[in-house]
């Protein structure tokens, strides 16, 4: 019997979308990452980076873990820290949902806020949050996760890639997923391509801030993706194409998933499915596309995604 709650990370369900996929399109399977302990895929990354830092001696038992976060990573780090006996200090912002703030606080986190420009997610905001986290980490007994530059983060998603491969019995034609730090899409791809290099990989970013596509930075409201700049560990050779999705389309799809499929998800998950539908239409009937339900809609009840 596993005694620690972090043993609940991973082995999440993979299901076939039943209603929103057109008849002549490929099948779309979604991996329900909200089945992880905190309700998001980021639990995988948080466990990986903290365990590696502790094993290497960078993180000591009495230390405080520090990170900038749009909330999902922060919740997962706060959770793993609570389970493993560390403290956690987040650089956060009012641009992100209140549910994420309250969940971090529930796990005992300390939060330093960086005020946004009318709750817009911009490159300026993200860079200010990163600078805040760096400054906090300069205190004695503090270790900065520094997810943007932390190569252990992508390794946390190797289990995700292996689970997808096994659950699909190797019958997978495309994987579609949003890019932020790029760790989740790259870590998953590394394993999928280890099994089959012919799997088509499509990265997704906000249309309003499509910097990976070579367009100007801008503001958007798809929480958790679209940094507004190219992340340091972005590897374009690990994707076959980049698709863009508008904030409105992502929000509308999140609502459709709830009403039509019974899947309660956040906006980035909506963006994933919008993009997956495009790939599925192109591939055609008989092919298989996998994407992720990144986190639960419960984290967005205070936002306009679920205000009716």
What kind of feature is each model-predicted range?
Residues 1-308:
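PLP-dependent amino-acid enzyme catalytic core
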């Amino acid at each position: 019997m596993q005694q620690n709650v972090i043993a609940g990370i991973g082995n999440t369900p993979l299901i076939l979308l039943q209603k929103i996929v057109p008849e002549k399109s490929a099948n779309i399977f979604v991996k329900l990452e909200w089945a992880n302990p905190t309700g998001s895929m980021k639990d995988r990354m948080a466990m990986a980076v903290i365990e590696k830092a502790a094993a290497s001696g960078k993180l000591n038992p009495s230390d405080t873990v520090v990170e900038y976060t749009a909330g999902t990573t922060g919740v997962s780090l706060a959770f793993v820290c609570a389970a493993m006996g560390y403290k956690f200090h987040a650089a956060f912002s009012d641009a992100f949902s209140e549910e994420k703030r309250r969940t971090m606080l529930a796990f005992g986190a300390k939060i330093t806020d960086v005020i946004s420009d009318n709750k817009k997610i911009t490159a300026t905001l993200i860079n200010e949050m990163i600078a805040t986290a760096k400054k906090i980490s300069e205190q004695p007994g503090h270790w900065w996760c520094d997810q943007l530059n932390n190569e252990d983060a992508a390794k946390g998603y190797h289990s995700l890639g292996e689970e997808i491969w096994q659950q699909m019995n190797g019958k997978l034609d495309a994987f579609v997923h949003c890019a932020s730090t790029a760790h989740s899409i790259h870590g998953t791809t590394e394993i999928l391509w280890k099994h089959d290099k012919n799997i088509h990989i499509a990265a997704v970013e906000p249309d309003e801030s499509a910097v990976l596509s070579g367009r100007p930075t801008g503001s958007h409201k798809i929480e958790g993706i679209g940094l507004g700049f190219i992340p340091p560990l972005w590897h374009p050779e690990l994707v076959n194409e980049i698709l863009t999705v508008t904030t409105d389309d992502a929000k509308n799809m999140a609502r459709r998933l709830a009403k039509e499929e019974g899947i309660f998800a956040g906006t980035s998950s909506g963006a994933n499915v919008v993009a997956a539908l495009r790939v599925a239409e192109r591939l055609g009937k008989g092919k298989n596309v996998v994407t992720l339900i990144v986190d639960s809609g419960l984290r967005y009840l205070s936002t306009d995604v679920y205000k009716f």
